[in-house]
Amino acid sequence: ANKIVIIPDHYIFTSDSLSNRNVDILREFAKAQGLQYFYDVIDDEGGKWKFDASQGLLKRQYGSRYAGVCHTALPQKGHLRPGEILFGTDSHTCMAGAFNQFATGIGNTDAGFVMGTGKLLIKVPETMHFRLEGELQPGVMAKDIILHAIGEIGFDGATYRAMQFDGPGAAGLSMDDRMTVANMAIEAGGKNGIFEYDDKTGAMVDERTKLNGTKSDYEPVERDSDETFVYDTTIDLGALEPTVACHPDPGQRKLAREMTGMKLDRAYIGSCTGGKTSDFLAFAEVVRGQEVCIDTFGVPATPEIVHDLQTTEWDGKSVWSILTDAGVRMTENAGCSACLGGPVDTFGRMNEGGQKCISATNRNFPGRMGSKESEVYLASPATVAASALAGHVADPREYLN
């Protein structure tokens, strides 16, 4: 039971009664099974979850145990350990590969089998090797690395394959950056994305397992000496530029500077991919002291990130205030929100057709963020910020002092 973690994060802050009921069903299941790690939306174990629309969408409506987006919460709560295997009922489970785990998404039937037997039959995937060299230039982010890679191989180019990232460039990336890259392996069809273990990995894992009292022993995995690759490439991080994945799939790559004529209706920053503290800090650096000119929505991935943004100060002003003063609609209700559309009252959802949104999220198939007639363009938090200021796709390098 201590190997099972249940984190409600989709369709939480909505008046949709069936969505609310799902949380109550989870609570009853976790109680019946004696599951220690259920991160409930409310504190009352005998209560019922009901979103109160009269309070609006911006004010916090969750209890002390709520964890937010599962993929971001798992490392924060000390549930990720190098060398282990993680199965999750969401395709972006591969984000945990940043921590030297074999992590992949599975369906509900497989999840039931895992919970009942502790086993699952999977094929060993072939490996695609991405050696990263150099370092990212100002205005270029980890999101640009993975958008570049997917643009090279296509949105099905890694189907049932492992995407392995290593080299000096990978070693130079922060854990947040590695999470962004590993997270989007699935957008190329990847079975998983994985990074090598190093001191950065160990430091975060050790800190978080100690803080949360979770299992702290682990054995990292290393490359086999005779490892072979079905694809082998080197990416010079210093040569990358701000990149956009265009509607209708993550493989439609263009450079931001090539798209500056394209007008936008809204901007969105959030999700497991683009809603981490470092993502919001990068966004705030661009918009600081200025004002966005299109509807811009901000959804931190977890309550911890909400706290970070409200307590981190720049020149005596919280980053949260810097963002709201710039016109960003920030919600304290951390979660998946409009990254995957959701019920019509979901914060940031595109309910009208014909709208174009630039987003720091991870997926842009038709209907992903709401209306099937809307279009989603994926970019880094910095590129989303610059574009929110400009009202059209913009290169963040022009906005950084």
What are these regions (language model features)?
Residues 1-401:
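Fe-S-dependent hydro-lyases/dehydratases of central metabolism
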